[in-house]
Amino acid sequence: MLADPITLTVNAVPFTLNRTGETDQSSPNSSVYATSDLNRHLRVSHQTAKIDTVRSLIRSEVRKVSADPLNASISTYKTVSVYLVIEHPTAGFSTTEIDQEVQGFKALLTTSLVGELMGGEV
């Protein structure tokens, strides 16, 4: 079981997310964490993808109120999600080897690359 609460730091601002007790409907082996204002969520789950393969997911979501660009008097919640899925066999790779792949992937996600992705580059 992960720590409770979990601290997620975004742009040098720490956010405390407490376990809510709910699970992700798509996976009974999951947990949901949220800030007290419910504007940030962290979802963690594990699913069996194949007989010997597990799909582990960690997903961060943040929502905010945003004005309609065509009608400033109308505001709605908008959400952005960032997540990582690690699909791994139940045997054959050590936790250290998987972590090395994750750390390499995280290093790839520079500000420049994220900007290019948001610009629609492939």
What role is predicted for each listed range?
Residues 1, 37, 53, 75-79:
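A generic structural signal for short, non-catalytic loop/turn and secondary-structure boundary residues
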Residues 1-18, 114-122:
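Short, intrinsically disordered N-terminal pre-domain segments
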Residues 9-11, 45-47, 85-89:
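A structural detector for beta-sheet-dominated domains
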Residues 13-35:
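Extended, solvent-exposed segments with strong compositional bias
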Residues 27-59:
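Amphipathic, interaction-prone secondary-structure segments
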Residues 59-65:
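Short, acidic/charged, Gly/Pro-enriched secondary-structure junctions
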Residues 65-117:
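Beta-strand-rich solenoidal segments
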